[in-house]
Swiss-Prot record:
SUPFAM superfamilies: alpha/beta-Hydrolases. Keywords: Hydrolase, Serine esterase. Coiled coil: none annotated. The lineage of its organism: Bacteria, Pseudomonadati, Pseudomonadota, Gammaproteobacteria, Enterobacterales. Belongs to the FrsA family. Its EC number is 3.1.1.1. The keyword Hydrolase applies. This is Esterase FrsA. It catalyses: a carboxylic ester + H2O = an alcohol + a carboxylate + H(+). Signal peptide: none annotated.
């Protein structure tokens, strides 16, 4: 079946699909203060989703393309779940968030199929994969159309990997008590085994969102990047996120001695946002297997345990947390009680001495991850490093921060 035919088959209308903003039914807090964050984007009036321009541009999307798709959504006069929110158009049709971003992805998919130059074709496939992921964002459980977009993103990513420099292998890892999970091993040119970074992504992202991290920061240093999806999404969708948040990543770590391209004696973990919760747990529970752990904007304690902090967070992000925990119909009080159990301080880990070197990068006044969380991580480590990243200019400082973090990882691996 051709890629185009697959798109038509997956998105063929069968019934009235639920609209994304209705999937998690919590009590709405009402008006919230505006939020701006380097890693998560910002709240914009009349949008349910946070608009994450920095990360989308960092992944290779042109700012004009983002505005074009947003304009098509805004201009639609189709029925919406909430007339005050542009991105709540019901059904797979013009103006619907998933429809418009997937339509844009198909344009690049067609360019990729028509392009004869393998590397340029690979770039187009990667662009399509990124757009399909934005279509599926924020990846809520039970969002049928989003899950179809994720499937197309994975297919496009596999096509891109066959054409881009280096080698990418799709790996299957067995996890006792449930379904196996799939990861992607990104390898630079040269002879292995290579030092390796295990990527622990955020809850609102897919493992295929981090190719830019590999290409710009790890590959030039001769470091392999291994990704898996977080529990409850993508290739890990059959696994629910639990208080043992690092379960899947632990089983992957334990399997690395059997992966011939990986030097299992030189492995680090890198966690974005809630992925830092996973990475720091690994630092404590699997310290003999890890040379270092790095975190960026970590969600390890305050957001999970502080009600005032939770009140400052956009509805969409709370919906993501509720979705990952399988609490689609829970009250806000029940969600707060459950989130508290995910705090690594409450679990008795953070605050105890950890032998693994840990770095944590943060932005001042980050609504998701205050400086105190990063200080808690680095002060708990026998070899801790605290890294403040200035907010403006956002893109340049984000790049500079990543360069410093990957340089720190390299020193501990190579």
């Amino acid at each position: 079946m051709t890629q185009a035919n697959l798109s038509e088959t997956l998105f063929k209308p069968r019934f009235k699909h639920p609209e994304t903003s209705t999937l998690v039914r919590r009590f709405n807090h009402g008006a919230q203060p505006p939020v701006q964050s380097a890693l998560d984007g910002k709240t914009i009036p009349h949008w349910y989703r946070m608009i994450n321009r920095l990360m989308w541009i960092w992944r290779g999307i042109d700012p004009r393309e983002i505005l074009d798709v947003q304009a098509r959504i805004v201009m639609s006069d189709a029925e919406r779940t909430d007339d005050d929110l542009y991105d709540t158009v019901i059904g797979y049709r013009g103006g619907n968030w998933i429809y418009e971003w997937a339509t844009q992805a198909m344009v690049w998919q067609q360019k990729a199929c028509a392009e004869e130059d393998p590397q340029l074709s690979g770039r187009h496939w990667l662009h399509a994969a990124t757009l399909y992921n934005i279509a599926a964002y924020p990846h809520l459980k039970g969002d049928d159309l989003a899950e179809q977009a994720q499937a197309l993103s994975n297919r496009a990513y596999e096509e891109a990997a066959q054409r881009l420099p280096g080698t990418m292998r799709q790996m299957e890892f067995t996890v006792p008590g449930g379904a196996p999970i799939t990861g992607f091993l990104h390898m630079p040119k040269g002879d292995g085994p290579f030092p390796t970074v295990l990527m622990c992504g955020g809850l609102d992202a897919m493992q295929t969102d981090y190719y830019s991290l590999y290409e710009r920061y790890f590959a030039p240093r001769g470091i392999v990047m291994l990704t898996i999806d977080m529990p409850s999404v993508g290739f890990s969708s059959k696994w629910k996120l639990t208080q043992d948040s690092s379960l899947l990543h632990q089983h992957v770590l334990k399997a690395l001695p059997n992966v011939p391209w990986v030097d299992h004696t030189r492995v680090a973990a890198f966690g974005f946002r809630f992925g830092a919760n996973v990475a720091v747990r690994l630092a404590y529970l699997e310290s003999p297997r890890l040379k270092a752990v790095a975190c960026l904007g970590p969600v390890v304690h305050t957001l999970l345990s502080d009600f005032k902090c939770q009140q400052q967070v956009p509805e969409m992000y709370l919906d993501v947390l509720a979705s990952r925990l399988g609490m689609h119909d829970a009250s806000d009080e029940a969600l707060r009680v459950e989130l508290n159990r995910y705090s690594l301080k409450v679990q008795g880990l953070l605050g105890r001495r950890c032998p693994t070197p840990m770095l944590s990068g943060y932005w001042k006044n980050d609504p998701f991850s205050p400086e105190e969380d990063s200080r808690l991580i680095t002060s708990s480590s026998a070899d801790g490093k605290l890294l403040e990243i200035p907010f403006y200019p956002v893109y340049r400082n984000f790049d500079k921060g990543l360069q410093e973090i990957t340089g720190w990882i390299e020193k501990r691996l190579c």
